[in-house]
Structure formats: structure tokens, C-alpha cells
Amino acid sequence: GPTAGYQCLSLDEAALTEALVDHMWPKDGLGAGGTELGIATFIDRQLAGAYGSGDRLYLQGPFRKGRPQHGYQLPLTPAQYYKAGCAGMTAACQARFGKPFDKLAAAEREAFLLDIAGGKVRAGAVDLGGWFNSLVYPLFTQGAFADPIYGGNQGKAAWKLIGYPGLPAVY
């Protein structure tokens, strides 16, 4: 399970995040799983930093329900949105399965994530499909393929997997 080393995520949010990234990037014969790759750490660091606090977002409103092409239309910082989505996903998972996401079997996780990504699961005011597709998945892919200095892609494992040598450290 998660340790207290996270900067932004609570232990429950970290457990959900680790389960998400491990399901989306499972450990196999090719290498480490998502948590070992540092994807959960990357997500936590992004949410704990300037990005997570909405440093470059206009958050003064008015906030109206828009279309997907209108972009981000919420009065929440990315960190607040991530946490609201975690709470919503946990509540929806408890209602559907009677247990949290990190305790589900792989097939249950897959079915649930497909329903979330497809917009079939709502949790109160949180559109979990929008949350997953516009926040979680981009953070996941960034964490997998970013420069390891940001916490993800440990040992450049994702780069090695796709044959990318990385940038030379020359000055």
C-alpha cells in the first residue's frame, strides 16, 4: 500500500492512484508496473506543485456548463478536481462493488474504468468520464513518458520500451 511520502494525495487517494496506474501499466515480462515506474509519484508531484494549484488557470468565473471543446470550465484547481474525482470514483465503486477500487479484481477494474472513460458513471457533481479523460489519463501518460527528473519514468523504462534513448545530458 501507499506510504506517507505523498505530498498532495491522502493515503486513500494514493491507494486509488496506485491501483489505477498499476492497472493501466501492469507489471509484466517487459518491466515494472505503473507504481514502480513512478507514475503515481509523478501525479502527486504535479498536483502538489504549481500545476495542481491552478497557477496558469483563470479561476475567477463565471463558470458555466460548456461543451468539451470549450475546455476546462470548473471552479476547481487541478488538485481539487483530482481529489473530487477520487472521492466520486470511490463512492461509485463502493456503490457498485461494495469495496474500493484498489480491492477489485482486474476484470472488475477494467469494466469499471471502461464505463468511467465512456461517460457511463457519474458521481454527484463530478463527471467521472471528463475527469478521467481530461485529467487522469493525461497525467498518466505524462508520468509514464516524462523525463525521470519529474518523478515518473523511473530508470527511463518507458523510453527504453519504445526505443527512445532520451536526450543526452550535455551542457
Regions found by a protein language model. Name each.
Residues 2-3, 11-19, 23-26, 30-171:
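Mature-region segments of soluble proteins
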